[in-house]
Amino acid sequence: MGLIVQKFGGTSVGSVERILNVANRVIEEKKNGNDVVVVVSAMGKTTDELVDLAKQISAHPPKREMDMLLTTGEQVTISLLAMALNEKGYEAISYTGWQAGITTEPVFGNARILNIETEKIQKQLNEGKIVVVAGFQGIDEHGEITTLGRGGSDTTAVALAAALKAEKCDIYTDVTGVFTTDPRYVKSARKLASISYDEMLELANLGAGVLHPRAVEFAKNYGITLEVRSSMEREEGTIIEEEVTMEQNLVVRGVAFEDEITRVTVFGLPNSLTSLSTIFTTLAQNRINVDIIIQSATDAETTNLSFSIKSDDLEETMAVLENNKNLLNYQGIESETGLAKVSIVGSGMISNPGVAAKMFEVLALNGIQVKMVSTSEIKVSTVVEESQMIKAVEALHQAFELSGSAVKSER
């Protein structure tokens, strides 16, 4: 029939029992007459355990050696899953990222996929085998092993689906699909039957952990239909595709949130045409992702600049700014931790003015101070105190009527 790429995350392969369950799910797809490529993550908390081992040796281990270490986690999973499939009577072969032909840029820890040579995988598929590929890893032009960073296995799966021209890419997780918000925190959250690439990309960028943004970008660019499903349950998941026809004109489709956000403020920057370019180029060269940006001129000659980052990046951000003080020519810097980002997302915002005003009204009525704001055509993001994050999410979820059958859609 066709080719299906399946991806199973760390929780889904977290034990031998779960790997055997995954093998059964793979076999079901094979029995449907499809060729199957399976991408897997390291088992359970293996990656975290490997990081802990490294930190017992060195507080600042070389990035190359970290990639060498971390890629061993997926190698365990691929071999065990291939063994399970063969034991159940289905020929399977496992490949590391570099054996699978995945070439990346020469960056350790957060490389991007540049190309995938599919001949080896295609040969095995033509012979009727199931191909099991390690997610999260590849090889650069110098023959060095690299990792793809957070969400790398999602990206591997969608990139393989694009390169192999697969009909579909199924992302199996420990949840049954994409929800209007995280059901662990908001009990009234409901699963979406379908969602557009653009909406999913915004949700992923804004902290919805079910899919990595790079994976959604790949899917959108190559027209790959995604389905987020549970590896433990049999119910349908959430389809992610280009167009979604909704039963109702829902303005907002989801509320996303992310904790551990820090605001960095740079005081007394020269109020010149090049000062912003210089500071953000410097941060980008050090692979520091800046999110929400606010600029306020203090006088004709100087300006203050605030931007939000992930708290994990604070130490490096401050070091980069301090090391480049002469270049950037600022007067001072400070940081504010203990913040969170809360966002609403929905394509309906394009044709419905007043959404941001309603959001701010809801937050104000609940005594929640907004510290920073960012908007696009289909989202509004705010930075608030981390202690008020869940209160804000619950209030917005209720105000925009995201509970119940209204969130369902047709496809």
From Swiss-Prot:
Q: What are the recorded GO MF terms, alphabetically?
A: aspartate kinase activity; ATP binding
Pathway as given in its UniProt record: Amino-acid biosynthesis; L-lysine biosynthesis via DAP pathway; (S)-tetrahydrodipicolinate from L-aspartate: step 1/4; Amino-acid biosynthesis; L-methionine biosynthesis via de novo pathway; L-homoserine from L-aspartate: step 1/3; Amino-acid biosynthesis; L-threonine biosynthesis; L-threonine from L-aspartate: step 1/5
Q: Where is this site: Contribution to the catalysis?
A: 7, 74
Recorded hits in PROSITE patterns, A to Z, give:
ACT, ASPARTOKINASE
Q: Which residues form the ACT domain?
A: 264-338, 344-411
GO cellular component annotations, sorted alphabetically? cytosol
Q: What class of enzyme is it?
A: transferase
Per the entry, what modulates this protein's activity? Lysine-sensitive.
- Which reaction is this enzyme known to catalyze? L-aspartate + ATP = 4-phospho-L-aspartate + ADP
Gene Ontology biological process: diaminopimelate biosynthetic process; homoserine biosynthetic process; lysine biosynthetic process via diaminopimelate; threonine biosynthetic process
Q: Where does ATP bind?
A: 7-10, 41, 173-174, 179-184
- Please state the Enzyme Commission number of this protein: 2.7.2.4
What keywords sit in the KW lines? Amino-acid biosynthesis, ATP-binding, Diaminopimelate biosynthesis, Kinase, Lysine biosynthesis, Nucleotide-binding, Repeat, Transferase
Pfam families assigned to the protein according to its UniProt record, in alphabetical order:
AA_kinase, ACT_9
Entry binding sites for substrate: 25-30, 47-49, 74, 125-126, 150-153, 289-291, 295, 355-356, 369-370, 376-377
Per its UniProt record, what PANTHER family does this chain match?
ASPARTATE KINASE, ASPARTOKINASE
- Family of the protein in this entry: Belongs to the aspartokinase family.
Assembly: Tetramer consisting of 2 isoforms Alpha (catalytic and regulation) and of a homodimer of 2 isoforms Beta (regulation).
Summarizing the function annotation, the protein's role is: Catalyzes the phosphorylation of the beta-carboxyl group of aspartic acid with ATP to yield 4-phospho-L-aspartate, which is involved in the branched biosynthetic pathway leading to the biosynthesis of amino acids threonine, isoleucine and methionine.
Q: What is this protein called?
A: Aspartokinase
Organism (species)? Bacillus sp. (strain MGA3)
Q: Which gene encodes it?
A: lysC
